[in-house]
Amino acid sequence: MALVRSIFSAKKILGGSLARTSKAPKGFLAVYVGENQEKKQRYFVPVSYLKQPSFQALLSKCEEEFGFDHPMGGLTICCPEYTFISITSRIQ
């Protein structure tokens, strides 16, 4: 439950223009989530998520369908935001 709160808190923090230019905190990586290029949300996720099978599966699916070469310049996960939140909320 704390993870869900931290993800939602991160989303709140990232809502402002300052968040668009700030670097990811140490131990985190910025990802852009969403199906629509104009409506992608930026999230900071712990680097440890990269070891989690469910997160790896999400990345693999996105790579197969869309590739990772996107104009956003960061790691882009092309899935609905609710899917991303659902998967990351189960990672502990």
UniProtKB/Swiss-Prot annotation:
Location in or out of the cell: Cell membrane
Entries under InterPro entries matching the protein: SAUR_fam (IPR003676)
Alphabetical keyword list: Auxin signaling pathway, Cell membrane, Developmental protein, Growth regulation, Membrane
Record's GO cellular component terms: plasma membrane
Induction comment from the UniProt entry of this chain: Accumulates in response to sirtinol (a small molecule that activates many auxin-inducible genes and responses) and auxin. Expressed in the dark. PIF4-dependent regulation by temperature. In low thermo-responsive cultivars (e.g. Col-0), higher expression at 28 degrees Celsius than at 22 degrees Celsius in petioles but not in leaf blades. In high thermo-responsive cultivars (e.g. cv. Alst-1 and cv. Ang-0) higher expression at 28 degrees Celsius than at 22 degrees Celsius in both petioles and leaf blades.
Superkingdom assignment: Eukaryota
Bilayer disposition of the protein: Peripheral membrane protein
Main subcellular localisation: membrane
Consequence of gene disruption: Reduced rosette weight and area at 22 degrees Celsius but not at 28 degrees Celsius.
GO annotation terms (biological process): auxin-activated signaling pathway; positive regulation of cell growth; regulation of auxin polar transport; response to absence of light; response to auxin; response to temperature stimulus
Pfam families, sorted: Auxin_inducible
Tissue specificity statement from the Swiss-Prot or TrEMBL entry: Higher expression in thermo-responsive cultivars (e.g. cv. Alst-1, cv. Ang-0 and cv. Com-0) than in low thermo-responsive cultivars (e.g. cv. Dja-1, cv. El-0 and cv. Kon).
More info: Exhibits a high natural sequence polymorphism between cultivars, thus conferring thermo-adaptation to environmental conditions.
Family: Belongs to the ARG7 family.
Function noted in UniProt: Functions as a positive effector of cell expansion through modulation of auxin transport. Involved in thermo-responsiveness of plant architecture. Enhances plasma membrane H(+)-ATPase.
Name of this chain's protein: Auxin-responsive protein SAUR28
Native organism: Arabidopsis thaliana
Native organism taxonomy: Eukaryota, Viridiplantae, Streptophyta, Embryophyta, Tracheophyta
